[in-house]
């Protein structure tokens, strides 16, 4: 079972709303076939949160969102 906490992610992205948007966008990227930056044994949402907590993905995800 995945043991990732929101507190770990909030250390990287302090705004919980931006955190939600970043995790959502990254999870969608993973579903589209992008390569995970951490161990990929979990669902895309959990992988996205793990990447954020590890510092591999950050607020820059919001700048990549197509308008």
UniProtKB/Swiss-Prot annotation:
NCBIfam families: rpoZ (TIGR00690)
Signal peptide extent: none
Descriptive protein name: DNA-directed RNA polymerase subunit omega
Listed InterPro entries: DNA-dir_RNA_pol_omega, Pol_omega/Rpo6/RPB6, RPB6/omega-like_sf
EC number: 2.7.7.6
Example GO molecular function: DNA binding
Function field: Promotes RNA polymerase assembly. Latches the N- and C-terminal regions of the beta' subunit thereby facilitating its interaction with the beta and alpha subunits.
PANTHER family: DNA-DIRECTED RNA POLYMERASE SUBUNIT OMEGA
A GO biological process held by the record: DNA-templated transcription
Highest taxon in the source lineage: Bacteria
Keyword entries, A-Z: DNA-directed RNA polymerase, Nucleotidyltransferase, Transcription, Transferase
Keyword Nucleotidyltransferase part of the UniProt annotation: yes
Pfam families reported in the protein's UniProt record: RNA_pol_Rpb6
Family: Belongs to the RNA polymerase subunit omega family.
Catalytic activity: RNA(n) + a ribonucleoside 5'-triphosphate = RNA(n+1) + diphosphate
Keyword Cell division set for record: no
GO cellular component: DNA-directed RNA polymerase complex
Gene3D superfamilies in the record: 3.90.940.10
Oligomeric form and interacting partners: The RNAP catalytic core consists of 2 alpha, 1 beta, 1 beta' and 1 omega subunit. When a sigma factor is associated with the core the holoenzyme is formed, which can initiate transcription.
């Amino acid at each position: 079972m995945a043991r990732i906490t929101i507190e770990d992610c909030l250390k990287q992205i302090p705004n919980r709303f931006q955190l939600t948007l970043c995790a959502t966008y990254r999870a969608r990227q993973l579903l589209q076939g992008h390569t995970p930056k951490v161990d990929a044994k979990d669902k895309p949402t959990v992988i996205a949160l793990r990447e954020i907590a590890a510092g591999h993905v950050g607020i820059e995800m919001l700048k990549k969102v197509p308008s």
